[in-house]
């Protein structure tokens, strides 16, 4: 077995382990953030400052009985959370999380694969995760799950179109689909960040990413007041945990990608080293998603579709045309 294969396997194991752990810890952070906005304490009983609440929740999750409803398609019911997990973690393959560094005289590239269509790969594999809620809803033999999967189809497909068109303008400016090249394009300094050249693309992509991530106010797939837990209604134990980890893994992936594409990525930020800079940026966007959840109410499905097709899509197309004209001039 070659050194390259061994290195890649080690990177994959580290990526899955780190982001699985971060997914669990993110629940604690989100509960604390929401509690702060709502003037509550949040988790505070299990361990100092409630830090061991994550471990307690993990033990409870793994010891719960794994129930499959009567009349459900067992194979597809089991396959759906696996698709969600695989889609979330495989989409991270082209993301450069940190600048290259040397360890014991060996240069380490902190990404799985630097492919020249990295951004397209990220969007395509992430979009494949749409099959998880669709199959989960269809296989559960539950009306609420079925409604949730139908909402997943219209919401995720609609916003996948918007996010893809939105990101075309920044890619036209850079001239590459590689996330490493996009990062290097902004290495000149603060004013080279693409957010200043493509502010409309940033806003549209951020909104579309929240819709794709099923984050409030766009969590129509599992709206508690209307359809219980949506496509997850019949899931429990480890299978439910896989959906939950996949959702947070997608959140971290989008936070890193937004930081790389629009905010200079892992380039040094003044006196702040690049590795720390990208952690600050990605951490801010994770926090922003929690802030939005605490601030905005749910939207109706018709409002969401109107915003997608009548507002965001025309703006994305207009941005592409204007960017093309500016490049030609």
Swiss-Prot record:
GO biological processes: aerobic respiration
Keyword Transport: no
Keyword entries, A-Z: Cell inner membrane, Cell membrane, Membrane, NAD, Quinone, Translocase, Transmembrane, Transmembrane helix, Ubiquinone
GO annotation, cellular component aspect: plasma membrane
Membrane topology value: Multi-pass membrane protein
InterPro entries: NADH_UbQ_OxRdtase_su1/FPO, NADH_UbQ_OxRdtase_su1_CS
Main location: membrane
Residue ranges crossing the lipid bilayer per the database entry: 9-29, 42-62, 75-95, 117-137, 154-174, 188-208, 238-258, 269-291, 309-329
Pfam family, one: NADHdh
UniProt subcellular location: Cell inner membrane
GO molecular function, one term: NADH dehydrogenase activity
EC numbers on record: 7.1.1.-
Catalyzed chemical reaction(s): a quinone + NADH + 5 H(+)(in) = a quinol + NAD(+) + 4 H(+)(out)
Cited PROSITE patterns: COMPLEX1_ND1_1
Quaternary structure, from the entry: NDH-1 is composed of 14 different subunits. Subunits NuoA, H, J, K, L, M, N constitute the membrane sector of the complex.
Membership in a protein family: Belongs to the complex I subunit 1 family.
Function: NDH-1 shuttles electrons from NADH, via FMN and iron-sulfur (Fe-S) centers, to quinones in the respiratory chain. The immediate electron acceptor for the enzyme in this species is believed to be ubiquinone. Couples the redox reaction to proton translocation (for every two electrons transferred, four hydrogen ions are translocated across the cytoplasmic membrane), and thus conserves the redox energy in a proton gradient. This subunit may bind ubiquinone.
Full protein name: NADH-quinone oxidoreductase subunit H
